Amino acid sequence: MNYALETNDKEIFDLIHEELDRQNTHLEMIASENFTFPAVMEAMGSVLTNKYAEGYPYKRYYGGCEFVDRVEEIAIERAKKLFGCGFANVQPHAGSQANVAVYNALLKPYDKILGMDLSHGGHLTHGAKVSVTGQTYQSFFYGVELDGYINYDKVEEIAKIVKPQMIVCGFSAYARELDFKRFREIADSVGALLLGDVAHVAGLIVAGEYPNPFPHCHIVTTTTHKTLRGPRGGMILTNDEEIAKKIDKAVFPGMQGGPLMHVIAAKAVGFGENLKPEWKEYAKQVKANAKVLAKVLMARGYTLVSGGTDNHLILVSLLDKEFSGKDADRALGEAGITVNKNTVPGETRSPFVTSGVRIGSAALTARGMREKEFEFIATKIADVLDDVNNAAKHAEIKKEIAEFAKGFPVYTKAIF
C-alpha cells in the first residue's frame, strides 16, 4: 500500500499546498474562519477515522470501542468544564446539524420558532425560509433597530404576539453582546424554550470575554471551530437531564449514524487548548484587535452597524456607498484580504450582492497580530474600498500584504 499522498495523489497534494500558500500570504478575515492547532490536525489525521462507534460511550452498537469510548468521554468532560454545564453532546458534525437536532428533539413540525432575521445578523438555521428549519417549523423573526442594537422590549412584544415554542438567541453577524438573562425573561413570559446559538463567540465565552449563556438558556449550541479554533464540527450543551436525553436520541439515531471519532478526538484536543491559561489572553486580543478595525474604518468614513463591536467581528454597511458588498468582497480579495459580503439591516440588494461586508479578527490574532498590525490592516482595507474599482492599485496593495504576512506564518507544512 502506498501511504504517501504526494506520490499517491499528486493533484490533491499540490492543491493542498497551494492552499497553504494562500493562507500564509493572504489575510484571512472571514469572521467564521480561524487557524486550528497543529495538534488538532494530527488528531483528525489519526487512525481513529477507521472506527465506527454508533451510540454513546459504553453504550455502543459495535465492538472494539474501548479506546474511542474514552476519547469521547474526555471530549464531553472538557466541554462541560469549559461552559460550566452538566451535559454535552459532542457528536454533531456541524453547527447547523446541532441546531436541527435541537429542534427535532424538542419541537413538533409546524411549532413556532422566533429567531433573529437573517438580514439583521441571524443564521439560516434560525428559521430562514430557504433552510429546512423554516420549512419544517413556523418561523418568525426579530431584528435590530436603526442604531444596530436589539431592542429587547420589541422582541418581547413580538414573542407575546407569536407565542413561540422556542426562542433562538444567536447570530452570524451581530457585533454586540447578547443579554441572555433578558432573553430568558422573555422566553419565560410566553412559556418558550430558549436556545442559545453561540457558534461565533464560544471562544470568547469560555475565556470570560463574553457573557455565558448558562444558566439562562435551556440549550446551547455551538460550532467547535470559529473562535474556539478547534476542528470543524458542532456541539450541544444543557443543564437539564431530560432535555439531554432527548438531544442524545435526536442526534443518534435520529439524525446521524456513526460519529466521526477522529473529529471528536480533535474536539477534545481543541478543548484542552481552550482550558489553558493563555487562552484568555488570545480572547482578549481578539476583541482588542476588532476594536482597532472598527476605530480606523469609522475614522475613514465607513459606517459600522451598531457603531462598533463587543466581540470578534464588525459589520460594515455600504448602504451609503455606490458600490455593493459583492464589489467590496471582490476588491479586497484582489488585494489579498479575504472577507465576505453580508446583508445588513435595511438591505436593498439581493443576498448574492448585499450592501455590507463582515470582517473578523480571530484568525489574524491566531497568527500573532496585535493592535499595531490591525491598524495597518484597517488602513489598507480603507485604501482598497476608497478606490474599489482600481485593480492596479489593489495589485500593489496585494504585494504589500504578502510581504507583511511573511512576518506572521500560519504553518510551516500543509499536512499533519
Curated annotation (Swiss-Prot):
UniProt superkingdom: Bacteria
The annotated pathway is: One-carbon metabolism; tetrahydrofolate interconversion; Amino-acid biosynthesis; glycine biosynthesis; glycine from L-serine: step 1/1
Under Enzyme Commission nomenclature, its number is: 2.1.2.1
Q: Which cofactor does it need?
A: pyridoxal 5'-phosphate
What are the alphabetically sorted keywords of the record? Amino-acid biosynthesis, Cytoplasm, One-carbon metabolism, Pyridoxal phosphate, Transferase
Reactions it catalyzes = (6R)-5,10-methylene-5,6,7,8-tetrahydrofolate + glycine + H2O = (6S)-5,6,7,8-tetrahydrofolate + L-serine
Q: Which InterPro entries match?
A: PyrdxlP-dep_Trfase, PyrdxlP-dep_Trfase_major, PyrdxlP-dep_Trfase_small, Ser_HO-MeTrfase, Ser_HO-MeTrfase-like, Ser_HO-MeTrfase_PLP_BS, SHMT-like_dom
What's its top-level EC category? transferase
Q: Where is this site: Plays an important role in substrate specificity?
A: 225
Residue positions annotated to bind (6S)-5,6,7,8-tetrahydrofolate are 118, 122-124, 242, 350-352
Q: Name one GO cellular component term.
A: cytosol
Annotated signal peptide: none
The subunit structure is: Homodimer.
> What function is annotated for this protein?
Catalyzes the reversible interconversion of serine and glycine with tetrahydrofolate (THF) serving as the one-carbon carrier. This reaction serves as the major source of one-carbon groups required for the biosynthesis of purines, thymidylate, methionine, and other important biomolecules. Also exhibits THF-independent aldolase activity toward beta-hydroxyamino acids, producing glycine and aldehydes, via a retro-aldol mechanism.
Cited NCBIfam families: PRK00011.1
Q: What is this protein called?
A: Serine hydroxymethyltransferase
**What species is this protein from?**
Wolinella succinogenes (strain ATCC 29543 / DSM 1740 / CCUG 13145 / JCM 31913 / LMG 7466 / NCTC 11488 / FDC 602W)
